[in-house]
């Protein structure tokens, strides 16, 4: 008997609504004096009309792309490779219950990490704890641009590529192996959306604390960066353990998350050097070699 699944709320719609809800909290707060210890440095580009237009356009594009590419029940890419097969054999959980809990845990981590820069860094720390609504708003706009860009690229890539999730290999006629069996979600493997959004938020948190002393000027910032980085890494591994993504999907998602979470705010707002008010000296140094290109992040915290 074929099970009828309830329609899923598109994650792009949820992200756009969450951003709108968080933004309303900034406007709902009464005006108050700025805290003395948290200021937006003159050399950092401030959010302006172009950023607001860009963020609105990105939000609309996320909704549009989500509707245009809902996924296909017949994946267009079913190819495999030794790297993906080896990682799957090593990490995939054999028990359906264990895979289910791995998936639920990764969902919780993904949601928490996706909201973290906007809810914790921008609202709770900058606006409430440090009493600096100006810095909080600047951080929130950067968060919106970064998260919505990552979401848009993720959903568009999933819809255009149409790669089969690894779990499709195990789906029998009844689809008991996984709830995604037979659904449109089974063709949204590349790239890993949980990973791209989680790594995006972790990278953005690390960049924010490197420039703005949200966690103080001691070990708080590096510890927060390490914590969200480990959490994002955990989400990445759990997606393979739950048989939701191939390892190459996870690697691509992590690369996108790093680009949108770190390079995006550096290029558009902070610049690639520590300002006068920076909580640390932060540098991104390109390293080129034969067949490789790396960006080395270095700094003193």
Residues covered by each model-derived region:
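Interfacial/capping segments of alpha-helical transmembrane domains
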Residues: 71-85
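Transmembrane helix recognition focused on a "late"/terminal membrane span
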Residues: 115-118, 269
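Conserved, well-structured interaction surfaces
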Residues: 122-129
